[in-house]
Every structure is written in C-alpha cells, then in structure tokens.
C-alpha cells in the first residue's frame, strides 16, 4: 500500500510518525557517524539549547575594525533582526543540510572570492566599493559592515553568505540591480516570504503546545516565524537575476548567466532556474523530490508528499575553504574563524588511531596551538570535519552530475581511416553542450569553471607520445597567459581546446 492510497484521517498521525522514521534514515547520508549536523532524531547533545541560544541571542554587533565599543551606526540593529540559518535549521533540517554545503553558503567564505574582490578593488582604486559584497555578504553590507572586514570581524549571518533570509525575507521584485536588494529586518517571529502561504505553519501555531513552539519572546518553546506570506517571484527565474546578471560598467559584463538563459531553449520551453538548480536531478528539469516542509520537535509538519525544492542549488562550484569553516556546521561555531585556521586538518590531528600513537610516543608530538592542545578538543574538531567532508562528498557528486548532464564528449574520430603502424595519425573529439539553459561553461567571467580537454596518446609501453591540455608548474593551461611559457621553460600547447572566456578591455587599452 502506498502513501497516496492511505486516505483515512485517523491514520495521519501514524503516517507522520512513519515518515519521520524514514526521513531519519534518508537524512543519514548527510551525517558522520550516523548523526546529522543538526540532530533531528532525538539525539540532542547535552548543550543543544545553549548552542542555539548563543547563536540567536540579542548580542550587539562589535565595532568592526577593532575595539570593544559599539559602532553607533550599527547599535540600532540587533543581530536578531537578521536571524541565522542555524535558527531556521532547527525545524527545516533537510533544507539546512542541503544549504550548508551549497554555493550560496560558500559565497562569503570563499577564499577565491576574497582574493578576486581584493584585486578588483585595488585595480579600481577602491571605486568598486561594496559592489561584490552586496551579493556575497548581502546582510553584512545592509547593516553597514565595512567592505574590507575579514570574516573573523563579521557577524555570523554575514559569514553565512546567501543565507535563508537573503531570499525568504525579500518581498519585492528588484530584477537587474547587481545585488542591490533589500532584506526585510525582523526577528525570527516575523513572517517569511514563499511561493505559498504555508498551511503547515498555521497547523503548528494552532497546536503550539503539542509542537512546543513559541511565536513571541514571552512564550516558551522553539521560536518560529509567525506565518508565511505569498511572494510568487521567489519561485521564478526573475528572482535570481538580481545577483546572476552582473554588469561592472556600461557595456562591461562580469556575469551573463541570465542573458544566456533568456536566449536558451530552456527559456522558450518555460523551464525556470529553479527547475534545474533545485529539482530532483542536478542540472535537469525532471521534476522535484517530495517531503514535509519541517520537522518540529521530532514531529512531521504538513503533507509528506509536498514538493521539495533542493537547497543545494546545484552548480559546478569547487570549495577550497578549510573544512572546519565550510560547510556550515553549527557545532563548528564553538571555535572562531582564526582558531579553525590553526587546526591542521591535512595532518591526522584528532584521528583516534593517531592520537593513540601520540600518547604512546610512537609518533612525534607536533607543536599544537594552545586551543588544540588536548586530545578531546582535537577529536571533537576532527568529528566536525568528518561530518563536513561527507557533505563535501555529496557536493562533489552533485557537481559531477551537473557537468555530466550538461555536456557530452564523443570520439575519437579518425580523419584518415583506421590508424596504421608507422603512419601519421589525425584524430579529433566532439564536445557538445547539451545543457538547454546555459552556455558551456557558464558563470562569472572571473570565477567560472575552467573547462578544457586533456588528450593523451600513449604507446604500448604506456609512454606518452602526444598530449594536449597539459598544465605548467603553476597549474595553468599553457596558452599565451602561462607564466612558465613566458619564462621559456615550457612549450606552447598548440592544440589546446579551452572553453575559458577571457576578459575583454576596449578603447584605449585595445582588445584581448
């Protein structure tokens, strides 16, 4: 018997309990040692409440740039007016786990973004201002955090990048504004904006004692938003264009994802950004998964067959941040950004077998930073990194799926018939973009994925007799931009197949 066949009202509670059991199993793919980033299966850590309360308390923002006083321009803005994703994740565990390793969650953390942003501001003598951070750190920009503030001086919600409220507290269409949108301030108790009116919220509020929730600071229980208001644009491609079509000046475009999409077969077929980037299959419009919108205090809320939009936001992003800082992990907030950066995760710190050998004197003791001087602390940090590495593996699989579902390689094709011993060989491959929504590759010209073809021909002994697509000692393709080529220590790759888009400059500087 399927869930769809069970109609009788007296079985609804049983179905919810059954789904919760199944959901607990399904969510385990996001876990390390069978425990989720946020414990939704009654395995709450002893300091669970303390962890959450510390995250969402009314802490005044510190004076950015140093000092212990309060910036007068920020004093009126409590952190609770811009709730953290950690608070949303208490009820929306599945969505939180998907978002935690997404490119949206990575937007503020990305070391590559920070280097690129610093370079652009230096090259423009600072005239770019907050142009980049108003997308990557929108809430931080809105509350007045200086552009140049490092991560360890920013508010938690700014470090979360494109966090829950960045989308679900926006209530008007902005269209092409290069990230200049406005997030509605408000505590966790204020309504959120979604494609529907969320009847599940009304159900929970009506049975607040059963779900043990609160809708105001005066009440006890899990704090939740007091409702959901319909904002249809959030489910349309036009919502995405505010950040994914970027012009740095008149006629100079840094990102043209929207224009590619508007000129695509996908657009003509009515396929939206959400259909491919939040659907069931990464990069393909093949419908959506299903599931309840929330699990509140272990109790399933709403229709278990409800459409589920995947908040992993599938894309080709490749994170290189410290795995203690990304993916977003509530337990990791026990330590500061600076402290995490001193944890050498590339070494076996915190791994039980290695820690045993360390105690037995079998391996030499490193000079641990004071914060990581005890085994217990190192093992706790390693546990968190293990959780995050599982999330990163899921992200890797999604990334591969996006690329494989959007492109195809055929060949080799031999131009002179079948190869013969002792004769020259001519062959080729055909690379096809089968993605109906974007060019290949797509994304920001500064940060888009580099796609090139690495072709190697080996002899019967395994020796390379021909190669194209090799890289120099700096990891760069050997085109005219290769530093090693300019140094004269490597040969130019004459047959390089490279889909990377080069920057264009015009007028006085000429073209490239």
Residue spans for each PLM region:
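N-terminal secretory signal peptides that target proteins for export/translocation
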Residues: 1-13
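Primarily the internal scaffold of c-type cytochrome electron-transfer domains
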Residues: 34-79, 95-124, 128, 145-512
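An acidic-aromatic substrate-binding cleft motif
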Residues: 81-85
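N-terminal compositionally biased, intrinsically disordered segments and leader/signal-like regions
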Residues: 3, 18, 506-507
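Bacterial N-terminal signal peptides
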Residues: 16-29
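Low-complexity, highly charged intrinsically disordered N-terminal segments
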Residues: 89-90
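Outer-membrane beta-barrel channel domains
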Residues: 131-138, 168-170
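Conserved, well-structured interaction surfaces
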Residues: 138-145
């Amino acid at each position: 018997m399927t869930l769809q066949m069970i109609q009788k009202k007296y079985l609804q509670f049983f179905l919810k309990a059954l789904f919760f059991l199944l959901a607990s199993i399904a969510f385990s793919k996001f876990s390390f040692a069978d425990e989720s980033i946020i414990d939704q299966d009654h395995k709450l850590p002893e300091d669970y409440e303390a962890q959450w309360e510390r995250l969402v308390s009314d802490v005044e923002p510190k004076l950015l740039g140093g000092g212990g006083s309060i910036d007068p321009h920020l004093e009126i803005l409590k952190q609770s007016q811009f709730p953290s994703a950690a608070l949303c994740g208490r009820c929306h565990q599945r969505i939180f786990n998907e978002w935690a390793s997404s490119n949206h969650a990575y937007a503020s953390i990305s070391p590559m973004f920070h280097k690129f942003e610093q370079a652009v501001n230096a090259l423009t003598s600072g005239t770019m201002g907050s142009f980049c951070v108003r997308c990557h750190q929108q809430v931080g920009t809105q509350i007045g955090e200086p552009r140049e503030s490092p991560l360890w001086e920013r508010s938690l919600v700014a470090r979360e990048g494109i966090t829950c409220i960045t989308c679900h507290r926006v209530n008007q269409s902005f269209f092409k504004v290069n990230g200049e949108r406005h997030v509605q301030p408000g505590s966790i108790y204020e309504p959120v904006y979604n494609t529907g009116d969320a009847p599940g919220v009304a159900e929970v509020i009506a049975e607040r004692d059963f779900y043990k929730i609160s809708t105001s600071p005066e009440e006890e229980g899990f704090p939740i938003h007091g409702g959901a208001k319909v904002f249809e644009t959030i489910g349309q491609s036009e919502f995405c264009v505010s950040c994914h079509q970027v012009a740095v000046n008149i006629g100079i475009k840094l990102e043209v994802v929207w224009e590619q999409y508007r000129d695509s077969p996908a657009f003509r077929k009515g396929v939206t950004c959400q259909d491919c980037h939040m659907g069931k299959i990464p990069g393909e419009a093949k419908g959506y998964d299903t599931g309840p919108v929330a699990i509140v205090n272990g109790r399933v809320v709403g229709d278990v067959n409800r459409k589920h939009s995947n908040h992993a936001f599938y894309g080709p992003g490749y994170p290189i941040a410290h795995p203690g800082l990304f993916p977003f992990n509530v337990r990791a907030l026990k330590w500061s950004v600076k402290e995490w950066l001193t944890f050498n995760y590339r070494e076996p710190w915190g791994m039980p077998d290695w820690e045993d050998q360390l105690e037995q004197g079998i391996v030499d003791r490193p000079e641990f930073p004071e914060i990581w001087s005890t085994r217990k602390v190192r093992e706790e940090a390693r546990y968190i990194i293990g959780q995050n590495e599982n999330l990163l593996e899921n992200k890797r699989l999604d990334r591969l799926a996006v690329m494989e579902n959007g492109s195809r390689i055929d060949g080799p094709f031999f131009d002179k018939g079948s190869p013969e011993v002792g004769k020259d060989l001519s062959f080729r491959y055909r690379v096809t973009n089968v993605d109906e929504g974007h060019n290949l590759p797509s994304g920001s010209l500064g940060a888009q994925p580099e796609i090139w073809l690495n072709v190697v021909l080996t002899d019967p002994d395994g020796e390379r007799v021909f190669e194209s697509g090799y890289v120099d000692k700096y990891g760069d393709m050997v085109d005219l931009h290769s530093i090693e080529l300019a140094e004269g220590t490597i040969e130019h790759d004459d047959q390089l197949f490279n889909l990377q888009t080069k920057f264009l400059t015009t007028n006085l500087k000429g073209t490239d």
